[in-house]
A protein has these predicted regions:
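Amphipathic alpha-helical interface surfaces
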Residues: 16, 37-40, 75
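Short, glycine/charged-enriched secondary-structure capping and boundary segments
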Residues: 18-20, 43, 79-80
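Thiol-based oxidoreductase modules, predominantly thioredoxin-like and allied folds used
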Residues: 25-48
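Thiol/disulfide oxidoreductase modules built on the thioredoxin-like
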Residues: 54-61
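A short, hydrophobic beta-strand/beta-hairpin element that forms part of a small beta-sheet core
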Residues: 61-73
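C-terminal cap of thioredoxin/glutaredoxin-like
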Residues: 70-95
C-alpha cells in the first residue's frame, strides 16, 4: 500500500485526492485532521533525504507518496514518472 500525505487546504493536493481517494491500494492521510497524522508526516519530512530541498525552501512537502520500502515521491509528477527517492524505512503507525 502507498501512503499519500495530503491536506484539505493544499491546492496541490486537490487532484491527488480526486485520483486516489477510492483506490484500496492507496491510503490518503490528511495531515490537517489529526495531530497523530501530522506528527507522523513531520517525523518523515524532518529526516528523509527526499525532503532536503523542501526543508531548505521552507515548503511543506505535500502531496507526498510513500511506498512500503520507505522511498518517497514529493509530487504527483514525480509519482507518475516513478521518481522515488530512497531513504529510511517508512514511519510505523503510532511512531512519534
Amino acid at each position: 500500500m502507498i501512503k499519500i500525505y495530503v491536506m484539505e487546504s493544499c491546492p496541490d493536493c486537490t487532484e491527488v485526492k480526486a485520483l486516489y481517494s477510492n483506490h484500496p491500494e492507496y491510503e490518503l492521510i490528511d495531515i490537517g485532521r489529526q495531530a497523530r497524522s501530522l506528527k507522523e508526516f513531520l517525523a518523515l519530512r524532518d529526516h528523509h533525504p527526499a525532503f532536503e530541498k523542501v526543508r531548505q525552501r521552507g515548503n511543506i512537502g505535500i502531496p507526498c507518496f510513500v511506498r512500503e520500502d520507505g522511498s518517497i515521491a514529493i509530487s504527483l509528477k514525480h509519482f507518475d514518472a516513478g521518481r522515488f527517492i530512497e531513504g529510511t524505512p517508512a514511519i510505523q503507525e503510532g511512531a512519534s
